[in-house]
C-alpha cells in the first residue's frame, strides 16, 4: 500500500492548518515527524475554504492580556449539532489571540456565556477585562448586558453598522474556525450534526499552533508556559 505523506498526515491531524504554520511547529521542534515536505493540494481544504476577501488587520494592539476582548456570534447553522446547538460565540484576547468558544442553542445565551467566560479568565489570570468589542447585534445590546459591563468597569466598543472589518479579529477567527470545521467534516464520514465537536477541536488546535500576529503560540502567551 502507498505510504501516507507524513506532512499531509499532520496537516489533517492539526485541523488542516496552513503549511506555513506547520513549518514553524516543525522548526520549533513541536512536530514529532523527522520529515517535513510539501504535499499535493488538499481537496478537503478547497471544499472548506470560504471565498470572501480577507478583512484588513487592526493596527492598534493591546499591550496586556484581557485589555481588549473581541466577540462575535455565529449562526444559526444549517444543521443542528449534537446537543441541540445552532449557534456559537467566540471571545478572543487581542494581545495573545487566545480564543474561547461556547456552543449555544439560542443567541440570547450570549450574556450568560460572557459572564461564564469573564469569571473564568479573570480568576485564572488575576486581571480584569477592560474593553469588549462586538458588533451591534441585539445579543450584546440588552439593558442587562449593558448594566453588567458598567458595574464591572468594562467599556463596550460597538462597531458601526455595516463595518464588520472593524471587528476583524472576531470575523477572521470565526471564518478560520468554520474553514477548519468544513475541511475536517469533508474528510470524515461523520454526520454533519458532529460539527460542534469539530468546532471545539478547531478552537483547541488554533490556540496551540503559531499565529501570524504573535511570536509564540496563543497558549504560550496566555499561560506563560511553553
Which ranges hold each PLM region?
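HHCC-type zinc-binding knuckle of retroelement integrases
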Residues: 1-226
Amino acid at each position: 500500500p502507498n505510504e501516507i505523506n507524513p506532512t499531509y498526515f499532520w496537516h489533517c491531524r492539526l485541523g488542516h492548518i496552513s503549511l506555513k504554520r506547520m513549518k514553524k511547529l516543525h522548526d520549533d521542534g513541536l512536530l514529532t515527524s523527522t520529515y517535513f515536505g510539501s504535499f499535493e493540494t488538499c481537496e478537503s481544504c478547497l471544499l472548506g475554504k470560504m471565498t470572501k476577501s480577507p478583512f484588513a488587520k487592526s493596527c492598534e494592539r493591546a499591550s496586556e492580556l484581557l485589555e481588549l476582548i473581541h466577540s462575535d456570534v455565529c449562526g444559526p447553522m444549517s444543521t443542528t449539532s449534537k446537543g441541540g446547538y445552532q449557534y456559537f460565540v467566540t471571545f478572543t484576547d487581542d494581545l495573545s489571540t487566545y480564543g474561547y468558544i461556547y456552543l449555544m442553542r439560542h443567541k440570547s445565551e450570549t450574556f450568560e456565556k460572557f459572564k461564564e467566560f469573564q469569571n473564568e479568565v479573570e480568576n485564572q489570570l488575576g486581571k480584569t477585562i477592560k474593553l469588549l468589542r462586538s458588533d451591534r447585534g441585539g445579543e450584546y445590546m440588552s439593558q442587562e448586558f449593558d448594566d453588567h459591563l458598567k458595574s464591572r468597569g468594562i467599556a463596550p466598543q460597538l462597531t458601526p453598522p455595516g463595518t464588520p472589518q472593524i471587528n476583524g479579529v472576531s470575523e477572521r477567527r470565526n471564518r478560520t474556525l468554520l474553514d477548519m470545521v468544513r475541511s475536517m467534516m469533508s474528510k470524515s464520514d461523520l454526520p454533519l450534526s458532529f460539527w460542534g465537536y469539530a468546532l471545539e477541536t478547531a478552537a483547541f488546535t488554533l490556540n496551540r499552533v503559531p499565529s501570524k500576529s504573535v511570536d509564540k503560540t496563543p497558549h504560550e502567551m496566555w499561560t506563560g508556559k511553553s
